[in-house]
Structure formats: C-alpha cells, structure tokens
C-alpha cells in the first residue's frame, strides 16, 4: 500500500504541475499575441522624424510660404517634428508629392483634392479656413468662381466674349478650370474651345486677374478670394472689372494630410490649425488669408466637386 501511494504521488503531482504550466503558457501566449497585434498595428502607422508641408502655387509662392511660418512653428512644437517646406511647380506636383509619400501635409484646391483622393484614399481633408467678407469674397468656408473682363472694354456680356481670349488658371484648378468646363459650358451650350477664340492657362488666379487688367486676355475665370488678394496688393480694384458670371459656392481650399501618419501626429496637426485663432503669433497669418478661424472638414464636404468631376470626365 505504501509503495502504491508512493507510485501515485510520484506520477500524479507532476501531471498537475504540467496542467498548471499549460494554463499559464496559454494565458501568456494569448497575452503576447494581443500585445504583438497591438505593436503590429502601431508599426503600420508612419512616424517620420520630419513632416513635409506644401501649398498649391500662387503668384508669390515663396512669400506665401513665409507667411505660413507661425503655423509651421506651431506644428513643429505640437508634433515634436521638424517641418520642411516643399516648393511646388504646379498643382499636380503637390499631388505627386502626396502620392509618393514625400509630402505629408498640404493645402490643395478642391478639385486637386478630389483628384488626389480618387487616386489614394489615404489623402484626407481635415480642415479649411472660414473667410472674412472681402471685395468679392463672401463670408464663410466657401468661395465662388467668377468670370471677369476689364471695365471699359467691349466685353460686357457673355455673348460679347465669343471668339475672344479667355484665361484659365491651371488644369487642376476648381474655379479656374473645372467650373468653367462643367458649369459655365451649360450657360453657353458648348465647350470652351468652341465658344472662345483661344483658351490659355496663366498659372494662377492672381496672374489671370492681372492679365485681364493689362489686356493680355479678354476675360478670365478666377476665385473670388484670390481676386481679393490682387486688390489688397493694389494691382486691381473691384471697379476695374466687369463680373459676367458667378459659380455656385465652392468649399474652400482643403488642408490635408496622409492618414497613414500615426493618430497622435494627425491629432496634433489638426490642433495646429483648429486652435490658430487662440495663438497671438498666428494673427498675421490669419489676417493674410482673411480668416478668423479654421473649421473642421471631411471628405463628404467636397461631393459637389466630385459630381462636377464626374460630369467633366463623362464628356471627355
């Protein structure tokens, strides 16, 4: 009997220990698996040492980038990342920078954003500015495309523009290309190239406005807030032009980032812009863009532009 009990104790006790060890290892495996999956998820987001910022080109892109310095300084402080500027040559170059993951944060035109987002859903809008009322600009987070001609010229009606020279801005522009080719062509009942004698691209809304004033083009499609920029620099006035057509309200320029950046970085980028109204050093920047505050935006806010793009693409 003693031998039997010894036999039982000798072999039964290790089995109990083994069972406990199996349970412990199972728990550890599950725990490590969970932690591993969390680490894997964290590893999939991007956490670069520096962030590259870009804007769509204007007449004075270098000077405008300098005006963004209080913004980028704040972004650098909040994110803990060095902020680098990318100097664009066209609307398309900013998009290519985003698609290639060279650019992390950017200011796009609405049409440019829709094009970029259709190619890569990770390019995500998060904010825009709410404009103050100006010479031609209305108050709020929207603007209009406007067809202007020089006051005192013979071009005082849409019909008078037949066979004349019209200025567009850039193929990626909303008010300077998309709206004219989709919304305005409904007014004239034909393509721009059939109605006008010549269609030219000037490169920016500011250059289009100046080209009208100087008589280099007979008319031009410009953004209302960009026209105001030229007026504020003393290169034009509202009294110097005829307004021949206005588009529907267009959502303002989208501020975007690549949503593959880590969540904490994206949150700090959003905070950079949404909180600008409370930053004294940003007043000059807000005054320059004629805004009191930034407002949050999402992809659906630009569905109007998507509909216009679809209509344009269907005609090509």
Language-model-detected regions and their locations in the chain:
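Bacterial N-terminal signal peptides
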Residues: 21-37
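An extracytoplasmic/periplasmic, membrane-proximal ligand-sensing/linker region
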Residues: 43-54, 59-70, 250, 256-257, ...
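Bilobed "Venus flytrap"/periplasmic-binding protein-like clamshell domains
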Residues: 48, 53-77, 88, 111, ...
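Hydrophobic residues within well-ordered alpha-helices
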Residues: 98-99, 161, 212-213
């Amino acid at each position: 009997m003693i031998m039997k009990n010894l036999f039982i104790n000798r072999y039964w006790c290790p089995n109990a220990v083994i069972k406990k060890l199996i349970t412990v290892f199972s728990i550890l495996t599950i725990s490590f698996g969970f932690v591993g999956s969390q680490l894997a998820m964290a590893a999939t987001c991007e956490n670069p040492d520096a962030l590259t910022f870009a804007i769509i080109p204007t007449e004075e892109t270098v000077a405008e980038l300098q005006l963004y310095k209080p913004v980028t300084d704040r972004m650098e402080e909040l994110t803990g990342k060095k902020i680098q500027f990318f100097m664009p040559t066209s609307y398309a170059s900013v998009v290519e920078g985003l698609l290639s993951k060279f650019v992390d944060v950017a200011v796009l035109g609405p049409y440019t954003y829709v094009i970029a987002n259709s190619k890569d859903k990770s390019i995500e809008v998060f904010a825009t500015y709410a404009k103050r009322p100006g010479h031609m600009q209305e108050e709020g987070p929207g603007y209009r495309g406007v067809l202007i001609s020089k006051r005192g010229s013979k071009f005082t009606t849409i019909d008078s523009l037949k066979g004349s020279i019209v200025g567009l801005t850039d193929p990626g522009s909303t008010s300077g290309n998309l709206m004219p080719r989709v919304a305005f062509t409904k007014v004239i009942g034909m393509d721009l190239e059939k109605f006008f004698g010549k269609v030219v691209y000037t490169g920016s809304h500011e250059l289009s406005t100046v080209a009208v004033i100087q008589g280099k083009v007979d008319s031009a499609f410009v953004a209302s807030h960009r026209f105001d920029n030229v007026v504020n620099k003393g290169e034009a006035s509202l009294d110097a032009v005829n307004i021949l057509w206005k588009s529907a309200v267009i959502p303002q320029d989208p501020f975007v980032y690549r949503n593959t950046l880590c969540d904490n970085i994206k949150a700090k980028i959003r905070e950079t812009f949404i909180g600008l109204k409370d930053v004294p050093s940003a007043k000059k920047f807000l005054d320059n863009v004629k805004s009191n505050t930034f407002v949050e935006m999402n992809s659906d806010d630009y569905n109007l532009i998507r509909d216009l793009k679809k209509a344009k693409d269907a005609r090509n």
